[in-house]
Amino acid sequence: MNSFTSALRPGPLGCSLALLLVVATAFPTSAPVREDSNTKASPDKTLTPPGRTIESIRSILETIKELRKEMCDHDVNCMNRKEALAEVNLHLPRLIEEDGCFPPAVNNETCLLRITSGLMEFRMYLEHLQAKFRSDEENTRVSMVLKNIQHLIKTLRPKVKNLNEEATLKPAVAVSLMENLQQKNQWLKTTTIHFILRGLTNFLEFTLRAVDLMECGCPCLRNFMGSASHGQNTPSCPLDT
């Protein structure tokens, strides 16, 4: 044992060789990684790194923002004309306190179920919006939003229990939507599209906050509860369970 130790002492060369041996055994070589990726072909990519979901939501929000600007020729008043949007008789998904996404009643399972089912409903609305825009660029953007929403659903679905895979629009809702989108009146058609895109924006913004809280974990929740309680004892963190 002493002779082996003394053999490594003469100068920095021995230390360098020892370090190289440790590094070589600690990390896999490039060949097996390539072989594994070729054989398994990463089927579902369900192991989403932390933060990837948040990046995806932000990207979708930015695409929707640009799409609405193009539809209104960058007229802010057009994008936020509430009195016009109020005339659209559609009840879009939204997150409320009972969905368990925010303090004080945080419930991850309930929240993820509501987020995923809401996204699936918005996906059906987006499918009806295909090829309903004035320009090819706008149609391309809404197709991109739909594709990214589908990917987001695929990412969240493995984490959700009791999800209804057969979600469909209610017949009355589907009829009302199609009537608005097939109107010769371009104003009503455009207003309906804006209404759906704004509803999706609001839903995604709340989803972003909820997912951010889940990924941050208890430090964020305790900070939130601490500031809300004004010095009172904060409850145990629901995200610990």
UniProtKB/Swiss-Prot annotation:
The keyword Cytoplasm does not apply. GO terms for cellular component: extracellular space; interleukin-6 receptor complex. InterPro entries: 4_helix_cytokine-like_core (IPR009079), IL-6-like (IPR003574), IL-6/GCSF/MGF (IPR030474), IL6/GCSF/MGF_CS (IPR030473). Residues 1-26 form the signal peptide. GO terms for biological process: acute-phase response; glucose homeostasis; hepatocyte proliferation; interleukin-6-mediated signaling pathway; liver regeneration; positive regulation of multicellular organismal process; positive regulation of receptor signaling pathway via JAK-STAT; positive regulation of receptor signaling pathway via STAT. Glycans are attached at N108. It comes from the Eukaryota. It is found in: Secreted. One of its GO terms (molecular function) is interleukin-6 receptor binding. Keywords: Acute phase, Cytokine, Disulfide bond, Glycoprotein, Growth factor, Secreted, Signal. Residues 32-51 are annotated as: Disordered. Disulfide bonds join C72-C78, C101-C111. Belongs to the IL-6 superfamily. Cytokine with a wide variety of biological functions in immunity, tissue regeneration, and metabolism. Binds to IL6R, then the complex associates to the signaling subunit IL6ST/gp130 to trigger the intracellular IL6-signaling pathway. The interaction with the membrane-bound IL6R and IL6ST stimulates 'classic signaling', whereas the binding of IL6 and soluble IL6R to IL6ST stimulates 'trans-signaling'. Alternatively, 'cluster signaling' occurs when membrane-bound IL6:IL6R complexes on transmitter cells activate IL6ST receptors on neighboring receiver cells. Component of a hexamer of two molecules each of IL6, IL6R and IL6ST; first binds to IL6R to associate with the signaling subunit IL6ST. Interacts with IL6R (via the N-terminal ectodomain); this interaction may be affected by IL6R-binding with SORL1, hence decreasing IL6 cis signaling. Interacts with SORL1 (via the N-terminal ectodomain); this interaction leads to IL6 internalization and lysosomal degradation. May form a trimeric complex with the soluble SORL1 ectodomain and soluble IL6R receptor; this interaction might stabilize circulating IL6, hence promoting IL6 trans signaling. PANTHER family: INTERLEUKIN-6 (PTHR48494:SF1). This is Interleukin-6. The gene is IL6.
